[in-house]
């Protein structure tokens, strides 16, 4: 973990160049598809979006990255519409076309996972628990569906997870509880609520922990800094990506995606 973190760190860009968000002539971009699966955790069908790489070949296996939204949001937030147009498809497509990122499949789930109600009804402990319950929906229902219906590689070396705000909190929680499944863990402006010793057992460390924060975040404020300090105090190697002018929204997300997809699946 420490060795790979040292390799990644000098390559991290504070922000993505404008060209990363543009569709370029001669470049083929991935296809966004909407799908759904039955969640035994929630006892209902749940939607997700999936980004398949250009020229997706069902006879070829691809690594997979799960990218999660924040509070009150849904599966469209990280790929279609955020504060403005999301350029996730272009950022990832350009990185792959430039040979800077592996061809990959990206999954954008709806992470609210209550067994008694479909959507978030407020910012309180009950709804927080529904978001935290996504670890069960993900590992018991969504991941098996993806592995059955799409041509993905399996194992922690081929599986990444990241998320924004509440999705960043869930990414940290899931990554720390299931290091056997996820080798690359990211978080963008993560919400508070992750507690514990902020350590993995020897031999269970992920290849990479990549945390992004925005200097102008007026929602979670210094919460990411607190996580950063805890990881540093406990000697956990990680990337600390502090976006100058980054707010709690699209520009911090784009900067993170630009860097994280370049670092994933290469350790």
Predicted regions and their residues:
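Non-catalytic cap/lid and distal C-terminal segments of serine-dependent acyl enzymes
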Residues: 1-267
């Amino acid at each position: 973990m420490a060795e790979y973190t040292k390799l990644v760190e000098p390559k991290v860009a504070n922000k993505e160049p404008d060209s990363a968000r543009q569709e370029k002539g001669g470049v083929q971009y991935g296809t966004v598809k909407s799908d759904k699966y039955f969640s035994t955790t929630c006892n209902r069908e749940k939607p997700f979006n999936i980004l398949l790489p250009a020229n997706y070949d069902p006879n070829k296996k691809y690594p997979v990255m799960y990218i999660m939204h924040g509070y009150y949001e849904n599966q469209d937030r990280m790929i279609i519409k955020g504060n403005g147009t999301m350029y996730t498809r272009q950022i990832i497509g350009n990185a792959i076309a430039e040979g800077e990122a592996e061809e990959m499949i990206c999954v954008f789930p709806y992470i609210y996972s209550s067994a008694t109600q479909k959507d978030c009804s407020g910012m309180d402990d009950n709804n927080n628990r529904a978001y935290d319950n996504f670890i069960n929906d993900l590992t018991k229902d969504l991941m098996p569906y993806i592995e059955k219906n799409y041509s993905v590689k399996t194992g922690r070396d081929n599986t990444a997870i990241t998320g924004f705000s509440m999705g960043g909190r869930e990414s940290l929680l899931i990554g720390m509880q299931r290091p056997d499944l996820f080798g690359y863990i990211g978080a963008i402006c993560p919400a508070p609520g992750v507690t514990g010793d902020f350590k993995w057992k020897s031999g269970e460390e992920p290849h990479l922990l990549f945390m992004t924060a925005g200097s102008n975040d007026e929602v979670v404020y210094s919460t990411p800094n607190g996580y950063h300090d805890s990881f540093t105090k406990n000697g956990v190697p990680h990337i600390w990506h502090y976006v100058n002018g980054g707010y709690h929204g699209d520009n911090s997300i784009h900067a993170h995606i630009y860097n994280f997809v370049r670092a994933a699946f290469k350790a």
